[in-house]
């Protein structure tokens, strides 16, 4: 798990209106059966500095801002339907992800941390547990 103090950026909560803002959050691709928005686009962190990644927002009804996500894993622990997996560790979930990313590696430069992937987005029961537990508010549930 990554500590906020160790980051070289300041996470900003997911834009609650991203679905209504096609200009800033256009659908740029698909990943594991869900839409990806703003991938490859430079966005700013809470300090107004460019995020070190350009990974975008993954999902629609269960959306995770991958530029903000710090791989805490709490969302996975509280989800009653297990809709999340680690992107770099398919099939794995929960805190303390198994796949450690070394600083300076190719994966580090691309992702910075593993990412919480809403691979079973359609299974969501809209309990909002993941949204409420995320320490950086990277998740937005839209029923």
UniProtKB/Swiss-Prot annotation:
[4Fe-4S] cluster binds at residues 79, 124, 127, 130. The keyword Oxidoreductase does not apply. The keyword Manganese does not apply. This is Zinc-containing ferredoxin. InterPro entries: 4Fe4S_Fe-S-bd, 4Fe4S_Fe_S_CS, Fd_Zn-bd, Fe-S_Ferredoxin, Zinc-ferredoxin. Residues 60-89, 115-143 form the 4Fe-4S ferredoxin-type domain. One of its GO terms (molecular function) is 3 iron, 4 sulfur cluster binding. Ferredoxins are iron-sulfur proteins that transfer electrons in a wide variety of metabolic reactions. Its cofactor is [3Fe-4S] cluster; [4Fe-4S] cluster; Zn(2+). Gene3D superfamilies: 3.30.70.20. [3Fe-4S] cluster binds at residues 69, 75, 134. Zn(2+) binds at residues 31, 34, 58, 117. Binds 1 [3Fe-4S] cluster. Keywords: 3Fe-4S, 4Fe-4S, Electron transport, Iron, Iron-sulfur, Metal-binding, Repeat, Transport, Zinc. Residues 13-60 are annotated as: N-terminal extension. The gene is zfx. Pfam families: Fer4. It comes from the Archaea.
